[in-house]
Amino acid sequence: MFFFGDASTRPQIKFLCLFIYFIYMEEIFEKSQLENEQPTSKEPEPALKPVDVMSIKNAAQYVNQKLSAKGYFSNKPNKLRQLLLLSLDSSQLIPENAENFEISEKVYENDRNVMNIIYSLLNSAEISKQFKETALKKMADKDAEIELLKNEVEKLNKKVDEKERNIQSLQLDKIKSDLQAKHYQAMLNNVNAKNKEQERTFRLYAEEVKRELRRNEMEVDRLESRLSNMNKRRASPRDDAEAEPKRQKFDNDRFLSLVKENSHLQHDLNKLVGVLLRLQKFLKSFGQLNSNSKVPSTFIPTDSELLAIDHHNFDLQKYDLILFDLLKPLNGDSIDDTFKFKKNNQTDKDQEIASLRNRLSEMEQNYERVLATMEQWKTYRKQK
């Protein structure tokens, strides 16, 4: 089985066959030499048995059939078509001296040896042929197996190539995913930066509104104090009973004007309360998860919200503390008196400041009308 492995061992097989053939021929030659070297007996040779002649004849017939089948003889008419032996075909080999020729034991022995050698060679050739056919068959089987293995290797190589393509595709997908992750991270950073900017803008805006409200409150307190002081300075006691109805009339007129002014002040107070409530509501939701942190366009309440506000139950100090607690976490940076707002926030702030200034101007005008009324009343009394 070792010598039929692949095509590289074919020369070894041929060499082995030739080596066996030469060993076999050498054994036959040594055997014949030993027989020739044996001492000859002086006794007369025994007569040839008919059985020996028949065996030589049968062997010659078998050998001639084999040689003829293998094409060793010529097909020409004047050529021999079989192997002639001196012991059997002496008349054909030496026809001129056939009558005087005597076939000896040596002739028969020689013919027998020739037949044995040819028979052995034919058998060796048959064995070599079978050996060669077997070897070729095994080689063909090995070649088929090699071809099958090659096909299998080719299939495996295709699978490996496909796996490599899949790996490359996965690597490309990973690179794309990394790029998308970086893009989304950049977007997240931008959103966080915008949120911080909006938070800072809102914080500044809230502080500005808070200061503006406090200025308005201080201005209202100042005007109320001024009005109260003027009333105290201008008020004078009257002993005359006749003047009491007129003074009562003046007090009623002044009371009506003050009631009207008080109504305006209550309306303004309700607006301020509504602004504070809206601001408080927005600050509570600002910065919470899944909440709309967009700064509203205005904090001025609607008419329906004003009707629902009861200023008598409004505690300014309480809401001031609440707003202070809500704005305290946002007060991370120092705030100057100069603010920079975006265009829309600046517009809203300007509108609210303008509205507050208009209300303040109306209050001042009302105050002036009150003073004018008091002067008219004073002049009227002097005329009386």
Curated annotation (Swiss-Prot):
Predominant cellular place of this UniProt entry's protein: membrane
InterPro entries, A to Z: Afadin/alpha-actinin-bd
Keywords of this entry: Autophagy, Coiled coil, Membrane, Protein transport, Transport
Protein name as catalogued: Autophagy-related protein 25
Family: Belongs to the ADIP family.
Any matching Pfam family: ADIP
Residue stretches in coiled coil: 132-236, 342-379
UniProt feature, compositional bias: Basic and acidic residues: 236-247
Region (Disordered): 224-247
Protein's job: Specifically required for selective degradation of peroxisomes via macropexophagy.
Single biological process term from Gene Ontology: protein transport
UniProt subcellular location: Preautophagosomal structure membrane
Higher taxonomy: Eukaryota, Fungi, Dikarya, Ascomycota, Saccharomycotina
GO terms for cellular component: phagophore assembly site membrane
Organism: Pichia angusta (Yeast)
Membrane topology: Peripheral membrane protein
